[in-house]
UniProtKB/Swiss-Prot annotation:
It comes from the Eukaryota. It is found in: Membrane. The gene is CNPPD1. InterPro entries: Cyclin_PHO80-like (IPR013922). This is Protein CNPPD1. GO terms for molecular function: cyclin-dependent protein serine/threonine kinase regulator activity; protein kinase binding. The chain crosses the membrane at residues 231-251. Keywords: Membrane, Transmembrane, Transmembrane helix.
């Protein structure tokens, strides 16, 4: 870039008129984009920043009416728009004027009580513009032009200017940090006002508000409350979850205990397996004395006890107890079935080994024998079977007996020696059919 042609005029003399264009500075471009974006000046880069935007004018009216509460010539937005358009007030002039007003509010509040808000706006903008655009610049505006823009004569403008400079003690220099602080405050006020007016905030408004210290503190406090609420809800949720699981466990345990107690009160409903009935002795009459017999239980009795313990453990569940009850009912009904003799030889599965006396034997049994004199299995005395009364359809050998002959000795009863009444068998078979096929 040729600085000589930029700084020197046609006659070769040094000229400062070229410094009126600062658009080539990168910081100037960033500041211009920031002002356009956050102060609602629009996205059109062709539009010049030579007047105040509507949101900025609203903030100026609100602030000056509060600072200068005099009822004479109260500042209106229409007047602000007219002056800013006629005098070409830039956003930087507006921010510098706000810095001056803030100084007056702290140094000379009496001056603000005497001047009207319209005059304060006019004179503060004029002093700020003169400070930014000194004499010799193209943007300079004389007092008569400011008076015409504000509808005030030149003498009144001169008086207002002298009083303003005296009240501020001619302290017009402003540090750039003060200017950017005012810019940040103005951006926050504009974003807040516009968001509240529309009912929603733009992304730019939210970014501006997040930069404000007051909003940061408020959002931080809000986040803390949200975190506390989330923790409280989490504790309540976990407590309720644990309470539900505990209640389910207690109810389940109570149901299981109740099922176990009911099953223990009715043990006869669950039949003993057929393998354990082989070692059962015939029931004796309650009025007769029962002799003491030696333990001649086969080795399979230990297996029966183990099966009984297993069955006792299975009864503890309600569903298992119900299944066992149904199965026992079926087995009890099937125990009365009498198959023909031919079927017994052909199908050994239909003739289970059992030692339980039949219905006829239980109803017609008499007193037991007096003394065990005959030798039994394993060289032990065996109690002879008592004489029993049978109906005419039952065989005389229907009761189980031990073979007392020494040459032909059996450790177990003859499975084919049991006989039943055919009449009862027919009735029980019909009952089984009704149980399996109710319809």
């Amino acid at each position: 870039m040729d600085l000589n042609g930029f700084l020197l005029d046609e006659e070769g003399a040094f000229s400062l008129s070229g410094f009126q264009e600062f658009t080539f500075l990168p910081r100037h471009q960033q500041l211009s984009e920031r002002v356009r974006k956050r102060l609602y000046y629009g996205w059109d880069k062709e539009c010049t920043l030579d007047n105040l935007s509507s949101p900025v004018a609203d903030i100026a009216v609100e602030l000056l009416q509060k600072v200068a509460p005099s009822p004479i010539r109260r500042l209106q937005k229409k007047y602000v728009s007219h002056v800013s358009r006629e005098a070409c007030i830039s956003p930087c002039s507006m921010m510098l004027a706000l810095v001056y007003i803030e100084r007056l509010r702290h140094r000379n509040p009496e001056y603000l009580q005497q001047i009207s808000s319209s005059d304060l706006f006019l004179i503060s903008m004029m002093v700020a513009s003169k400070y930014l655009y000194d004499e010799g610049e193209e943007e300079e505006v004389f007092n008569d032009e400011w008076g015409a823009a504000g509808k005030v004569d030149v003498q009144t403008m001169n008086t207002l200017e002298m009083n303003f400079l005296s009240a501020i003690d001619w302290s017009l220099y402003t540090d750039p940090r003060e200017l950017f602080e005012v810019l940040s405050w103005l951006e926050g006020r504009v974003a807040e006002k516009q968001g509240m007016w529309r009912g929603w905030f733009t992304y730019t408004d939210l970014c501006v508000l997040m930069e404000q210290s007051m909003w940061q503190q408020a959002l931080g406090h809000f986040y803390q409350q949200v975190v506390k609420l989330a923790c409280l809800l989490g504790v309540v949720y976990l407590t309720g979850f644990a309470a539900v699981f505990t209640s389910i466990a207690v109810v389940h345990r109570a149901v299981c205990t109740r099922s176990t107690s009911i099953t223990a009160l009715r043990p006869a409903l669950i039949p003993v397996e057929s393998g354990c009935q082989l070692g059962a002795q015939p029931a004796l009459a309650p009025e007769q004395p029962q002799p003491k017999l030696p333990d001649v239980s086969p080795p399979s009795s230990t297996h029966c006890l183990g099966e009984n313990e297993t069955a006792e453990e299975l009864r503890r569940g309600g569903v298992t107890a119900t299944a066992l009850y149904l199965w026992g009912s079926v087995m009890t009904a099937l125990s009365y079935v009498k198959a023909p003799d031919i079927a017994l030889h052909k199908s050994p599965l239909q003739a289970p080994l059992r030692k339980v006396p039949t219905a006829c034997e239980r109803s017609n049994r008499t007193a037991p024998v007096t003394a065990p004199n005959q030798p039994g299995p394993f060289g032990l005395a065996v109690l002879l079977a008592p004489p029993a009364l049978h109906c005419h359809t039952c065989s005389a050998a229907a009761r189980p007996t031990w073979d007392a002959t020494p040459n032909h000795r059996k450790d177990w009863l003859d499975p084919l020696g049991l006989r039943q009444c055919f009449l009862h068998a027919a009735l029980d078979l019909g009952r089984i059919k009704s149980f399996i096929f109710p319809s």
